[in-house]
């Protein structure tokens, strides 16, 4: 009867009753503890009693199969995240890798945590494991490119950028990254090659592709075409500061600084925070 009540209260999310019944069942038969502690921990999580859930799960994980250990470590990590303790959350995610080194879900989670914490070396290491086990997706490769650039591993960044384009031939973020990298490397030949590839992309009318093509045309010396595209962006998005920002950058490349300043002022008028973007692009 108690087991049926337990199932009922779990379904109803009446976690106080769930915990009460589990405690009674364990008192009646202590040997049932190992099979009930995880359910108790889940109920404690439902009540947002994360620290108590962690304590319960640690007891449960002492004497269970590797499969159940992984399950408990995932929930412990989740509890620590809810307690804003990423360091301990990461510790338990790593414990999962000790049991299952090719767990792609955990590798992705750890790589993302490393990425947002700007631990670029660790992020690279984890994503390379995902690549090795053939579980890396476009987002993983994109994060890897950024990390490689931050670590001044330009050859690796370029190699992985080409891999992303191979997987997704219309990935605009990677094309934009390639133009910046080749421009910084003063590799005019490669820059022009990328710009030609950008121009060949289908124009789907989005702001990003229009501005990217405007920039590409200017790099290829097609000034009139570049301004046709940036003016098209302004016409389609008159209240968006980024077309004005791009137009200013195009004017700057042509040493037309007065015209550039007018565009920057208009972008700033539309969004004063646009200065942050200008600093990143400068």
Model regions: which residues?
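Short coil turns that delineate tetratricopeptide repeat
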Residues: 30-31, 65-67, 101, 135, ...
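Register position in tetratricopeptide repeats
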Residues: 11, 46, 82, 116-117, ...
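Canonical positions in the second alpha-helix
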Residues: 25, 59-61, 95-96, 129-130, ...
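Start-of-helix register in tetratricopeptide repeats
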Residues: 34-35, 68-71, 105, 139, ...
